[in-house]
């Protein structure tokens, strides 16, 4: 590796990781409530320890969620069905401490009644719904992968997803739900990925498994297929370091081995460290919370900019004040990669094309639907196994037209 080259790493985790278990429980509850009442206001957190889960937070909804049943259903779907794997969905403890949303918060994002919705114009409605909290959010896109995601996090997610696939299908026997992946990519001085350096997989397994057998099986059924799919002939990967369970056996996993908590994998959820993060987590929050909806919107904006060929990579920063509809600020950073336009022109086009008020985001991306459980593992962005509305590139022509009109 030359002095100008850099090594960049990113990690992912499987759905059986204790923090991801908590994310999925929180989003399963959110989806259940949104399916009954699309205007539900939800902020639900989950914590996990050995054999017990605490579900807590605030909810205002016309719907009802049987939280205990939803927790157990989620755990069964992940694969925690026996004390042998460290957790039995049917016998674990579930403690629920959910209250109503604060009236002081609710007044800033109060739900519009049917009468108000009918009488008010869309513009009035957009002005009426302020942000659910203050905060700063970021969105990012880069043209180094077809999904416009950074290669390290995209590859790490694909490995984690495949690891779960072979576990659930039985293609690789003796695997258990908990697992992590990490990849390291070498970049040249033009910031282009030029070589795969390292692949790391740590996976929970049955006691009878040997480490040599596991390394061979994971290379054959997980690593090689994913590398061929993602890297192909574009990025050399014929001489990389493979690490499988480098500490040795990994029999005890999940919440039996480590406590879990909603919102503790925010870099895994987003861009693997390639972009800034405002600090707000996603799971368990309805779209009135800009931590979630604005992060999705900024990804949508960034992806359309790159898809339009205006820049090779872009980061969008947005900030809000609680109870105020219009963003406090919107910043566009192209890292000097803009193509035939200035950064100022791109920023002006963004302001013209995208309405980033919370209610407008919710409408444009159709966010008041039960679509969130699938986001809670393997990343919220750049997915190929499921379609999310913030991944659409439907504003490309409008952005080009806005640039041309300046």
Curated annotation (Swiss-Prot):
Binding site for L-methionine: 58, 101, 258, 289
Enzyme Commission number(s) from the entry: 2.5.1.6
GO molecular function: ATP binding; magnesium ion binding; methionine adenosyltransferase activity
InterPro entries registered for this protein in UniProt: ADOMET_SYNTHASE_CS, S-AdoMet_synt_C, S-AdoMet_synt_central, S-AdoMet_synt_N, S-AdoMet_synthetase, S-AdoMet_synthetase_sfam
PANTHER family: S-ADENOSYLMETHIONINE SYNTHETASE
Taxonomic source organism: Bifidobacterium longum (strain DJO10A)
Protein name per its UniProtKB record: S-adenosylmethionine synthase
Keywords: ATP-binding, Cytoplasm, Magnesium, Metal-binding, Nucleotide-binding, One-carbon metabolism, Potassium, Transferase
Entry's family note: Belongs to the AdoMet synthase family.
Record-listed K(+) binding positions: 45
Cofactor annotation: Mg(2+); K(+)
Record's GO cellular component terms: cytoplasm
One of the GO BP terms on file: one-carbon metabolic process
Pathway the protein takes part in: Amino-acid biosynthesis; S-adenosyl-L-methionine biosynthesis; S-adenosyl-L-methionine from L-methionine: step 1/1
Lineage: Bacteria, Bacillati, Actinomycetota, Actinomycetes, Bifidobacteriales
